[in-house]
């Protein structure tokens, strides 16, 4: 097994476990795998070669060693590591398969949708002032954006940090995770009991053997019994620590699930009105009583003064108000007074513009008088009647 494969495996286990599970994984790697591989091999490498009995009977020494150690300590611990880690590895394989299947299904759905547009309604923001297309624009308009851009915005938003439990629940892996946790705990308890019945808590310096083919009771001696006893107690402690971590993780999952359910119920009680209003797909519109402003026809540019342009704009605005406004019978008194003042101001503005045009265009008035004079020559009866009355006519 290469280190790169082990590194990838550990990264995946970290991504799909709680923080207590990550602590358990650290204990498994550091105190079990490394300690067994480094310390166990160096301590127990001469376990059988240094097992010496005070007899010359052929085969007696091998029989006594088999009675002393039915299973080697190192092989027992290696077998324990493999069986305890098997549920986690199986859970990891199932989790990777399920998540990959979910991602493949989501990718197919996105490809089938072919990036549909998400629509939302937004305020107009005074775009009418810059457009000159002679068209009526609504006060509300749909804003288009790509579905992918919307998803990227959602992903960029900061998500609340959690300990991995919520991610396991969101991926639908909670039952499998609890099942592998229970299996791991059962294996820990089984190996802890088996280690006690096989080796006890101490490695004795000698062993009395009376099995056949030994002719009588003989004494066999073990190398470095104190060192092996200390290492045996360390492995007991590591097994107990892993068992406590498993129990802690089960309690963490149970209390965390209960806390999440209580928090969700509390949020529902605090915000009961979130589900009282039915959702409709009606097109949004302006508030009641709000009139859509229609653009007037574009005024052709002439050489009129600014006063004449302002007059025409005011006249168009008044026409729009009369067209889309309420009836005069339903208007309040203040609004009627305001309209009368607007009409009076309009009349004054008309007189001012006429006087301004008469003052600035005297040549045009003389041409008009000449044309009227030619008309008067053709119609002598009307001219003589006006001259006979002695009245002068003023042409504006």
Swiss-Prot record:
SMART domains registered for this protein in UniProt: CNX, Connexin_CCC
Query: Which GO terms label this protein's molecular function in UniProt?
Result: gap junction channel activity; gap junction channel activity involved in AV node cell-bundle of His cell electrical coupling; monoatomic ion channel activity
Composition skew (Low complexity), residue ranges: 373-396
Origin: domain of life: Eukaryota
A single GO BP: gap junction assembly
Q: Where is this region: Disordered?
A: 146-165, 356-396
From the record, give the transmembrane residue ranges: 23-45, 76-95, 176-198, 229-248
One GO cellular component this record assigns the protein to is: nucleoplasm
Cytoplasmic compartment ranges equal 1-22, 96-175, 249-396
Q: Where located?
A: Cell membrane; Cell junction, Gap junction
One Pfam family named in its UniProt record: Connexin
InterPro entries, A to Z: Connexin (IPR000500), Connexin45 (IPR002265), Connexin_CCC (IPR019570), Connexin_CS (IPR017990), Connexin_N (IPR013092), Connexin_N_sf (IPR038359)
**Keywords carried by this UniProt record:** Cell junction, Cell membrane, Gap junction, Membrane, Transmembrane, Transmembrane helix
* Membrane topology, Extracellular segments: 46-75, 199-228
Q: List all Basic and acidic residues biased stretches.
A: 147-156
Q: How does it sit in the membrane?
A: Multi-pass membrane protein
What family does the database annotate?
A: Belongs to the connexin family. Gamma-type subfamily.
State what this protein does. Answer: One gap junction consists of a cluster of closely packed pairs of transmembrane channels, the connexons, through which materials of low MW diffuse from one cell to a neighboring cell.
Q: How does this chain assemble?
A: A connexon is composed of a hexamer of connexins. Interacts with CNST.
What is this protein identified as?
A: Gap junction gamma-1 protein
């Amino acid at each position: 097994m290469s280190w790169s494969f082990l590194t990838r495996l550990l990264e995946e286990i970290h991504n799909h476990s709680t923080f207590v599970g990550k602590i358990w994984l650290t204990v498994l790697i550091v105190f079990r795998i490394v300690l067994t591989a480094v310390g166990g091999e160096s301590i127990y490498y001469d376990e059988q070669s240094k097992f010496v009995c005070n007899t010359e009977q052929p085969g007696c020494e091998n029989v006594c060693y088999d009675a002393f150690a039915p299973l080697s300590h190192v092989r027992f611990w290696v077998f324990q590591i493999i069986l305890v880690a098997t549920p986690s590895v199986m859970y990891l394989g199932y989790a990777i398969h399920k998540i990959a299947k979910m991602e493949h299904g989501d990718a197919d759905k996105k490809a089938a949708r072919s990036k549909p547009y998400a629509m939302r309604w937004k305020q107009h923001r005074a775009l009418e002032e810059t457009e000159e297309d002679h068209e009526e624009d609504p006060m509300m308009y749909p804003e288009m954006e790509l579905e992918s851009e919307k998803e990227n915005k959602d992903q960029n938003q900061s998500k609340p940090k959690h300990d991995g439990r919520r991610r396991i629940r969101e991926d639908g892996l909670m039952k499998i995770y609890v099942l592998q946790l229970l299996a791991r705990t059962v294996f820990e308890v089984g190996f802890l009991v088996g280690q006690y019945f096989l080796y006890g808590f101490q490695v004795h310096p000698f062993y009395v053997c009376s099995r056949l083919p030994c002719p009588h009771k003989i004494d066999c001696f073990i190398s470095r019994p104190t060192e092996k006893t200390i290492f045996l107690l360390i492995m007991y402690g590591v097994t107990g620590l892993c068992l406590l971590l498993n129990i802690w993780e089960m309690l963490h999952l149970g209390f965390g699930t209960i806390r999440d359910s209580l928090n969700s119920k509390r949020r529902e009680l605090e915000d009961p009105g979130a589900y009282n209003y039915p959702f409709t797909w009606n097109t949004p519109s302006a508030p009641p009583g709000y009139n859509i402003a229609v653009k007037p026809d574009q005024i052709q540019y002439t050489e009129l003064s600014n006063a004449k342009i302002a007059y025409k704009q005011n006249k168009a605005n008044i026409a729009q108000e009369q067209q889309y406004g309420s009836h005069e019978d339903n208007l309040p008194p203040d609004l009627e007074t305001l309209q009368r003042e607007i009409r009076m101001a309009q009349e004054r503005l008309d007189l001012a513009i006429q006087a301004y045009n008469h003052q600035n265009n005297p040549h045009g008035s003389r041409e008009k008088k000449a044309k009227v004079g030619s008309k008067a020559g053709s119609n002598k009866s009307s001219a003589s009647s006006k001259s006979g009355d002695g009245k002068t006519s003023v042409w504006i």
